[in-house]
């Protein structure tokens, strides 16, 4: 149903809200017009079914204009979720995603623990035999320019040499 008014030689159709409610749409003062265009009637229909036109109107009027678009997007999302899951709505989706996140975090923790275990086993199997001071020969003091005598005392668990002076 088109309005009888003309703008630049063409008829102007009402917004989806006014069309569904069968009322005259004055684009300059209609709170629904910027957010529920005529070419997307399903958006207003689903929001109207779940929240009611009066409640949507009140919610939009209470918000500043820069927050209204986000509010409409949220209402459309919540209305779709309520249609798909009449009992839990979007809370059901949030709970499902939360459980999925917890499962993935648990799997990640197990994978990280397994990686540490494999690295530890690899380090143990590729560890060089421990050296003792008696099996290693060092150059004499005359080969050094200092008075410091250093000897390998032992190796640590990571296979790194520890020196003693």
Curated annotation (Swiss-Prot):
GO terms for molecular function: transcription cis-regulatory region binding. GO terms for cellular component: nucleus. The keyword Nucleus applies. Transmembrane segments: none annotated. It is found in: Nucleus. The keyword Membrane does not apply. Keywords: Nucleus. Expressed in young shoots, roots, stems, leaves and flowers. At the bases of lateral organs formed from vegetative, inflorescence, and floral meristems. InterPro entries: LOB. Residues 13-115 form the LOB domain. Induction: By cytokinin. Over-expression of LBD3 induces a dwarf phenotype. Belongs to the LOB domain-containing protein family. This is LOB domain-containing protein 3.
């Amino acid at each position: 149903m088109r309005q009888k008014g003309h703008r630049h030689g063409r008829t102007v159709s009402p917004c989806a809200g006014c069309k569904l409610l069968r009322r005259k749409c004055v684009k300059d003062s209609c709170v629904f017009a910027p957010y529920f265009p005529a070419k997307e009637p399903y958006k207003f229909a689903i929001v109207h079914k779940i929240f009611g036109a009066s409640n949507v109107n009140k919610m939009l009027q209470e918000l500043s204009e820069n927050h209204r678009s986000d509010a409409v997007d949220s209402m459309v999302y919540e209305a779709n979720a309520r249609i798909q899951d009449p009992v839990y709505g979007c809370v059901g989706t949030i709970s499902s995603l939360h459980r999925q996140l917890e499962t993935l975090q648990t799997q990640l923790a197990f994978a990280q623990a397994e990686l540490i275990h494999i690295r530890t086993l690899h380090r143990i199997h590729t560890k060089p035999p421990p050296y003792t001071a008696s099996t290693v020969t060092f150059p004499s003091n005359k080969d050094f320019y200092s008075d410091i005598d250093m000897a390998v005392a032992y190796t640590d668990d990571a296979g790194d040499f520890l020196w003693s002076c």
